[in-house]
Amino acid sequence: MTLSPEDLKTIEKYALQNAVKYEKAPQSKAVMGKVMGECPQLRANPGAVSTALKSIVSEIAKGNPEAWKTRLSEIAPELIEALNVKKEPEKGLKPLEGAEPGKVVMRFAPNPNGPGTLGSARGMVVNSEYVKMYKGKFVLRFDDTDPDIKRPMLEAYDWYLDDFKWLGVVPDRVVYASDHFPIYYDYARKLIEMGKAYVCFCKGEDFKRLKDAKQACPHRDTSPEENLMHWEKMLAGEYEDQQAVLRIKTDIEHKDPALRDWGAFRIRKMSHPRAEIGNKYVVWPLLDFAGAIEDHELGMTHIIRGKDLIDSEKRQGYIYKYFGWTYPKTTHWGRVKIHEFGKFSTSSLRKAIEAGEYSGWDDPRLPTIRAIRRRGIQAEALKKFMIEMGVGMTDVSISMESLYAENRKIVDPVANRYFFVWAPVELEIAGMEPTVAKLPLHPTDHSRGVREIAVGNKVLVCAEDVEKLELGSVIRLKDFCNIEITSLSPLQAKHSDVSLEALKKAKAKIVHWAPVDGISVKVRGPEGDLEGIGEKGIVGELDKIVQFERFGFCRIDAVSEEKVVAYFAHK
């Protein structure tokens, strides 16, 4: 088959595009792949294409980047344009592999050793959104079978349910893994009977030494009958803490030590915080075993988990293989690093709270869902923030500013405006008669009306504004009046006749202010607390988001006749 002039031109344009893109002679292998991918009709004669490509590449290599670009613009200007288009990273949720509408079953499985964090919020949002996308079933499963290292908190169960309610998600099922010990025990017996599990009495350090050397422990070849006897003794509490471990028999010579005869059950004579469980059990399933059984029993079709849990999937794969089950389709995603919080864990946060470093799980300095809710972050903003991260193996590094930007879109149109003055300094205005200032509740939505502030001859302004004032300068008290500074210490001023238009043209300083008889305001935020004075009208905004002008958006958390407590959301 002889290549047509059009075929040769096609090869040339893709070779030129490669040269222009990388500013060097075209790479034959890459160009060949491109040509074959874009031109199915040429796949029948790869030899002729390869020969022609070799000649064309040799000729192009004699030129320079400017000549390549000129020639490419002559024969295929659209390819020049394609090189100039910056490809945006994919955002949002990609289709799930093998997902069928109405048949998808997914779960979010937290350990309730504390409330949901921004880390767990990703799983809460993405799993529930996929289920919604495919009209499937969503399971909230509490993986609460660790009585020791990650001991459950009773309050955390309700906190997760409350967070899901806030997100607008109603799980189709709520499951407590700690209710299913009898099921786990039954499957353990079956594995023992099959010769796929055994009771190991090695000390931890001894087993590790053997495992690392790819050597079987002395108990590995114990008969199923004897293993069943030891298993029943474990359940009866006849062995001491950590005296015996039930192990899944895998490949003791596997190249990955983490997959060699991994532990499935251990003895811990401890109580469970749930009253229904209490001291009922002394043999506790480890997470890889319990999770494998749960995912099968609950009919999971798809799992999304961190790439750090790839080994868990491999360990669980042995159980699925032994029972002839099909493992759910699994997607792994990378870690998320939020700049403002760095690395954190629920366990470390719990210790810090118990040590008194934080006021509680909703302390505004913490990366918990409870904390950001209290600050005024809206559920829809968090959902969009998490969805736009997408699902991929690449680690994600992101700033809270992205979440704040989404939240700002939601709260800015609805938040009433008020003045809050921190570190207040008294400003006396000579000749000012008592009056009532009328200020807009919202700068663009005038249907909201105005807020009225009774003003005498004194107001409060921020100390940081005072530091920037100069004697004789004319400034505007926002939405009120123009004044001229006559003294810096004490701070005094007089009314100015300079027009508002002239002040705007001169870009004069605009200062927000508060009445001297305003209400005491405490703002709690990620950077610490601020005290000051605000308008009395703030007391009518309990549990609402407001904007303290020139300060930021805040949620009004508590009010009394003497004081307002607000939580800072963001600028």
From Swiss-Prot:
SUPFAM superfamilies: Nucleotidylyl transferase, Ribosomal protein L25-like. This is Glutamate--tRNA ligase. Catalyzes the attachment of glutamate to tRNA(Glu) in a two-step reaction: glutamate is first activated by ATP to form Glu-AMP and then transferred to the acceptor end of tRNA(Glu). Its EC number is 6.1.1.17. InterPro entries: Gln/Glu-tRNA_Ligase (IPR050132), Glu-tRNA-synth_arc/euk (IPR004526), Glu/Gln-tRNA-synth (IPR000924), Glu/Gln-tRNA-synth_Ib_cat-dom (IPR020058), Glu/Gln-tRNA-synth_Ib_codon-bd (IPR020059), Rbsml_bL25/Gln-tRNA_synth_N (IPR020056), Ribosomal_bL25/Gln-tRNA_synth (IPR011035), Rossmann-like_a/b/a_fold (IPR014729). GO terms for cellular component: cytosol. It comes from the Archaea. Keywords: Aminoacyl-tRNA synthetase, ATP-binding, Cytoplasm, Ligase, Nucleotide-binding, Protein biosynthesis. NCBIfam families: gltX_arch, PRK04156.1. Its main location: cytoplasm. It is an enzyme of class 6 (ligase). It is found in: Cytoplasm. GO terms for molecular function: ATP binding; glutamate-tRNA ligase activity. The lineage of its organism: Archaea, Methanobacteriati, Methanobacteriota, Stenosarchaea group, Methanomicrobia. One of its GO terms (biological process) is glutamyl-tRNA aminoacylation. Belongs to the class-I aminoacyl-tRNA synthetase family. Glutamate--tRNA ligase type 2 subfamily. The gene is gltX. It catalyses: tRNA(Glu) + L-glutamate + ATP = L-glutamyl-tRNA(Glu) + AMP + diphosphate. A motif ('HIGH' region) lies at residues 110-120.
